[in-house]
Amino acid sequence: MFSISESVKYGWAMMKENMHLSVLSTLLMLAVGAVSGGGKGLFKSLFGILAAILLIVIRIGYSKIFLRITDNDKPKFSDIFRSYPLFWKYLGISILFPVIVFVGLLLLILPGILWAVRFSFAPLILVDTNMGIIASMKESWAITEGNFWSLLLFWIVVGVLNFLGFLALGIGLLVSVPVTTFSSIFVYRALSRGRAGITI
C-alpha cells in the first residue's frame, strides 16, 4: 500500500533538493519533444524522426537519472544520454504498452483502463532493472496487484498536476513533471517492497 499525499510530498521535496538537475533535464526532454513531431517536407520529416529517436534516448536517461537520485546516487546531467543501450527494448515497450491499452479500450473501455493502470510501471521497471519487455510488463502486473483503485486515483492526480503545469504557460511543467516523476518512483518502490501476499 502507498499514500498518494506522501508520494506527492516526496516528489516535491526531491524536486526542490535536486532542482537544477531536475529542471534542466526536464527542459531538454520537453524541448526535444516539441520538435519531434516532424513536419511537411523531406528535411523536416527527417529532422522529426531524428528528434523522435533522440527523445527516446532522453526519456530513458531521464528515468534513470531520477531513479539514481531516489537511490541516493549523484548523477550528472550528461548521464541523460548514457542509457542508450536500452533503446530497442524501451522502443518496444513504448509501442506494445499503448497498443494493449488501445485494444482494451475497444473492448468496452474498462479493460483498457485496467491494463493501462496495471502495466503503467513497465517502462520504469525496464529502465530500472534492464528486464526484457514481457518480463517488465509481468512485473508491473505483479506489483500493482490489489492496488487498482489507488493507482487509478494516483495517475489522475499526476495528470491533473501536469495539466495545471501546462496551463501555467507551459513553464509549470518544469516543476510538475519532475515532481510527478519522483512521485511515480516513490509509488513504484513502495509497491515493489510490498508485493508479497497481495491479492486483487
Predicted regions and their residues:
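Interfacial aromatic "cap" segments that immediately flank transmembrane helices
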Residues: 2-32, 74-103, 115-166, 197-200
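Selective recognition of hydrophobic, aromatic-rich stretches within alpha-helical transmembrane segments
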Residues: 41-71, 98-138, 162-197
